[in-house]
Amino acid sequence: MPTFKLVLSDPISGKARQFEIKDPLAQRFIGLKIGDELDGSVLKDFLELPKGAKIRITGGSGIEGAPMHPGVPGPVKRYILADGPPGYWPPKRGMRKRKLVRGNTISDSIVQINAVIVYPQGYSGPPAIPLGAKEIEKLTKAKEGTPA
């Protein structure tokens, strides 16, 4: 019985929202890979997405905190020699380090899934994850020319 935390990002508003996904909806995510898209209507209980919107899986992390890596096939846990993101940001150019990562496939051992909303072509409506009151206030002050 898998349970996931889905972190859904909205490219229009720049905001992200976290949802807890439980069975039977969680079963729809099992077996998906990084880069796969699924219909946005699966989240109708949590968020109202525009018609035709999709959700693209961009990553995630396992129980132990290891990030999912798009270059490691399957739902496995492996050590890789990393020279850059995801999973390792070298302090100097050319440095490499052996890091533990998860594969690119979602399984029961994944606890967090990162995803982004893919809007239909030519969409010009409001964002699915709206700005908060403080952000709107900052934007209106900046537009008027007064310091925030």
Swiss-Prot record:
Superkingdom in the source lineage: Archaea
Coiled-coil portions: none
Keywords: Ribonucleoprotein, Ribosomal protein
Presence of the UniProt keyword Ribosomal protein in the record: yes
InterPro entries documented for this protein: Ribosomal_eS6, Ribosomal_eS6_arc, Ribosomal_eS6_CS
Pfam families xrefs: Ribosomal_S6e
One cellular component (GO) term of this entry: ribonucleoprotein complex
Listed GO biological process terms: translation
Keyword presence, Nuclease: no
MF-aspect GO terms: structural constituent of ribosome
PANTHER family from the UniProt entry: 40S RIBOSOMAL PROTEIN S6 (PTHR11502)
NCBIfam families assigned to the protein according to its UniProt record, in alphabetical order: PRK04290.1-2
Family: Belongs to the eukaryotic ribosomal protein eS6 family.
Protein name: Small ribosomal subunit protein eS6
Taxonomic lineage from the root: Archaea, Thermoproteota, Thermoprotei, Thermoproteales, Thermoproteaceae
Gene from which the chain derives: rps6e
